[in-house]
Amino acid sequence: MANCAIVGINWGDEGKGRMVDLLTEDYDVVVRFQGGGNAGHTVINEKGKFALHLLPSGIFRSGVVNILGNGVALDPENLWMEMQDVMAKGVELTPENLKISDRASLLLPWHRDMDELEETRLADKKYGSTKQGIAPFYSDKYQKKTVLAGELFYPEELKVHLADLMEWKNLTLTKVYGAKPYTMAMLEEWLETYCEKIKPYVCDTGAFLKEAQANGKNILFEAQLGSLRDLDYGIYPYTTSSNTTAAYAPIGSGLPSAKINDVIGVVKAYSTCVGEGPFVCEMFGDEAEELRKNGFEYGAKTGRPRRVGPIDIVATRYGVEVQAATAIALTKLDVLSYMDKIPVCTHYLLNGEQTDRFPFPSALKNAKPVIEYFDGWKCDISGARSWDDLPGAAQEYVTFIEKQIGCPIKYVSVGPERDSIVIR
């Protein structure tokens, strides 16, 4: 048995979904262990292009069991809509290949309202939320003000529980934000329209995972977002509200006894960021727009243009440390093929001194990038399938990054398709 976690090293959007899709042929189970519908994992295969927000990226592989663990922000509405979308494109979803933890907390209808209302209140001080209700959800979860998916099997008790929560939440909606209150009729419609649809998939996934582990099954843990969005280790407060690290996988998956053998950290060949907060290497103007256009850098969930810049060695090295990565997948190297000279941020200039250490979040706004330039390769590399197929300049770029971040780069993606990969 071998367990592997695939995690983001930077701000998210690194290409984790395509790596999970690639590697699932070697695994029996894929588990999402944190986060919700606020980010997207893009997968391109023979069935088409998919932007998965809640579903694990193993759903395209026959024989793979996909699990939404107890650490996930389970949004029944978004999940059911996503399930319908992928099933309409020929992907089979049954209670045999998709299982939802009965201990996963449900993202309730008012969580999205609270998210949008708070971002509006913050105005120019907003965090850049995707407005999917993630922060209000996790806040309520830790206040024990949500319901568990398993409560769907106890409908009478569930309605009483929801009524109590609604009374409490309506006070905030009406008194703080001046918004309309919820009614039980609204919640009953939500239960019938969405929760009843996903109910057949809800089960004791912890027991399933323990049995899988005992039987020597290979388990792949799929993270959302990246190190710099982690609640504890990220650029606080411009983080998500969950732990995005491999260390959280055993807890959020429902298999606390899991031993993670390999941690594959996914790094984009340049930097991108969605949302607010310090972004030391940010490009602006025409230079940024050209990179954004070549990489099609628009949020999978929001469609917002992503902030872009050169690869940030300082932030990436920190992300590798946070994740305890054992190998790296470098994605979208092909996007840089248009550049004559390729910029790399090797250090930060902070308080008049160069540093290669990632600073405390409050200091980041004062950091300036120290840029080094590498020769571009100026040719199409999308057909490369071996290391020797890559031009010398591309090899030099990859090996420089590898040396600087202190972790071997095992995979290099040169295109969006499943087989557009170089394995070293």
Feature locations, PLM:
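Non-transmembrane, aqueous-exposed alpha-helical and coiled segments at domain scale
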Residues: 1-424
